[in-house]
Design a protein with these regions (language model features):
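Left-handed beta-helix
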Residues: 132-133, 141-343
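Unchanged
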Residues: 1-203, 315-331, 337-343
Length: 343
């Protein structure tokens, strides 16, 4: 992120009880209230508030321009989802010009869109506020003993009719370098199954979440890992990956990876097979081991000849298994030693 950080900076703010008598974060609004000093010190015209459990790419400039053009005081990014998901999101009723007429937080019977009876207009949990309104509402909410101190449950519904509030249609957001007809990508990854599905999306020939747009690079930490390596080319002992993403430092030493997302410095030994799985950093897959439809946390060691994802009744006695059959294996505290690599 060096080039980015030459002009910008990031201040990580861990949860903390800043004021006497305060508890840990009681809701999304309280999380901002407990750090309100940072907003007041920066004194910006606008504050962008974004959830951390979603996967998407967004040109925030376009949403800010919409907010300014509408002379909005609060703007909610929204996207149509099937009505069966209404109970999972805040649902917006909006006028044709985008004015928010009502906000229903996680109601299964929330009204559908006027032009589409099968979908609701769901809040993405991303907001832009004009600072004066935001500060006023945060202070008022903190004093309200009947509030759950949450944007979706408390602040946004209370703003309807009191302040100019608009819904920004995320479907109109455009990323430089993407094809004109590219649909915006957004996934809520608040569940294990959703997290798994989002990773599996990356396997596509032309993934909906495009990691390869040179005009819109993903800013992330850079490491000094060597390139991934694939070794051995013998029957039953061929290092290869198909329809997969393989990160730096990973070595496929006679092992097969198919339809998977592999983290950094993973070792897949001879005869091992990893299919349709998400493997985090520093995992070690032993000889002839088989892993299918699983999420392996960092530093997991799969013993030789072990199987994961083939017998759910057995897996449930050892690991966590979701209703859809995704096996989640907890990591170990110690890292895999590079020197133990066996070929």
């Amino acid at each position: 992120m060096g080039g980015l950080l030459q002009q910008h900076f990031i201040i990580p703010v861990p949860a903390q009880m800043r004021s006497p008598g305060e508890d840990w974060y009681r809701g999304t609004a309280d999380a901002l209230h407990q750090n309100i000093n940072l907003i007041e010190q920066a004194d910006p015209h606008y504050v962008a508030i974004f959830g951390a459990d979603h996967i998407y790419r967004m040109n925030i400039r376009e949403m800010l321009e919409y907010h300014m053009h509408k002379r909005s005081q609060a703007t909610i990014a929204a996207i149509p989802v099937h009505k069966n998901q209404a109970a999972e999101f805040g649902v917006i009723e909006a006028a044709p010009d985008g004015t928010v007429l009502a906000f229903h937080e996680k109601r299964a019977d929330a009204p559908t869109m006027p032009d589409d009876p099968e979908r609701v207009f769901a809040s993405m949990g991303n907001y832009i506020f004009s600072t004066n309104l935001l500060l006023r509402e945060l202070y008022a909410d903190a004093e309200n003993e009947n509030s759950s101190h949450d944007f979706g449950r408390d602040i946004l519904p209370s703003l309807v009719g009191r302040a100019p509030m608009y819904a920004y249609d995320f479907q109109t957001n455009r990323i430089p370098g993407d094809p004109p007809n590219q649909e915006p990508y957004w996934r809520d990854v608040g569940t294990i199954d959703a997290f798994y599905d989002a990773n599996m999306d990356l396997r596509a020939i032309s993934p909906a979440l495009n990691l390869y747009n040179r005009q819109w690079p993903l800013r992330t930490a850079s490491y000094s890992d060597p390139p991934a390596k694939f070794i051995f080319d013998e029957q039953g002992r061929r290092g290869q990956a198909i329809d997969s993403i393989v990160s730096g430092g990973t070595i496929l030493s006679g092992g097969m990876v198919r339809g998977s997302v592999m983290g950094r410095n993973v070792k897949v030994h001879s005869g091992a097979v990893v299919e349709d799985s998400v493997v985090f950093d520093n995992c070690d897959i032993g000889r002839r081991a088989r892993v299918r439809r699983a999420i392996l946390d960092k530093n997991v060691r799969v013993p030789e000849d072990a199987t994961i994802g083939f017998n759910h009744e057995r897996d449930k006695t050892l690991y966590y298994v979701t209703e859809s059959g995704i096996v989640v294996v907890e990591g170990h505290r110690s890292t895999v030693e590079v020197a133990t690599m066996l070929v």
